[in-house]
Amino acid sequence: MKPPIFIIIMTTVISGTMMVLISSHWLLIWIGFEMNMLAIIPILMKKFNPRAMEASTKYFLTQATASMILMLGIIINLLYSGQWTMLHTPNPMASNMMTIALTMKLGLSPFHFWVPEVTQGISLSSGMILLTWQKIAPLSVLYQMAPSINPNLLMSMAIMSMLVAGWGGLNQTQLRKILAYSSIGHMGWMTSITVYNPTLMHLNLVMYIMMTLGTFMLFMYNSSLTTLSLSYSWNKFPLTTLLILMLMLSLGGLPPLSGFIPKWMIIQELTKNNMIIIPTFMAIAALLSLYFYMRLTYTTALTMFPSMNNMKMKWQFENTKKITLLPPLIIMSTMLLPMTPMMLILY
């Protein structure tokens, strides 16, 4: 893709998301979603091979269906309340339809099937945009809709997403699919707290984006797509092997790393709302995800695969890939736990 075209497309993607973020009018929000969806498709098709085209088609069909359900919910709300503003969604049917549409855009269970397939069919850079930036707009609308959302509907979808993420990631060897199931699980954690304390969703989103960006950048730096290729990186990029270990454990929510903060605060908030069984079940479901993160960590950093070469380190040219953003992202993704008291004040 030529740079001027790429700049125009990325500007449209960012403009669509910003329109959703700053609007309180349902029609403008819907237009922002459509701008964002139509502009992201050329980015997904950047490779221009049959697999990327198939992934883009699946993404388009899912997002178009979600947009149709969202518009239907908006029209029902308009007929019931006579207003286009987001703060007036008194009709439970309209609210439920909008919630289902937004969760379909996010990839929550039972509408999660498109996320692993689309992520597997596109490049790592496109997958990074899909699993980070594309989550911001639907979550911002859920944040503003929080008072009118049915908590039972959203909580059931959140718990299903955590279970699906845990079971789905267990037998995966493709790194993109592992990160897709990781995204489904983290979306479940975010939406579980939306109704009870929406600001905690912000914290979880920020932490998730930092950890996912760092992981994708490391995989792009290593040019790794499978667990096997990642396991051979120890003698080419020894430092990145250690960094991947830290990031995987942080994504799994293991203390004392940064990924533990949102899980800790969400479980604490749900317990304050006299919910004991649900956070216990969520913590158990998180163990499934932690298992495949630990397995990936073990194959990457704790085993040494046999080599026919007597040299431990491989000879290679100097890597010219720029990783300017990687050091601060890794620091924030792994070492923010001591700053939890300040986050408690903010959130």
Curated annotation (Swiss-Prot):
Keyword terms: Electron transport, Membrane, Mitochondrion, Mitochondrion inner membrane, NAD, Respiratory chain, Translocase, Transmembrane, Transmembrane helix, Transport, Ubiquinone
Organism per entry: Ailurus fulgens
Function: Core subunit of the mitochondrial membrane respiratory chain NADH dehydrogenase (Complex I) which catalyzes electron transfer from NADH through the respiratory chain, using ubiquinone as an electron acceptor. Essential for the catalytic activity and assembly of complex I.
Pfam families in the record: NADH_dehy_S2_C, Proton_antipo_M
Similarity comment text for this entry: Belongs to the complex I subunit 2 family.
Protein name from the UniProt record: NADH-ubiquinone oxidoreductase chain 2
Signal peptide: none
Entry keyword annotation includes Kinase: no
Key word Zinc present: no
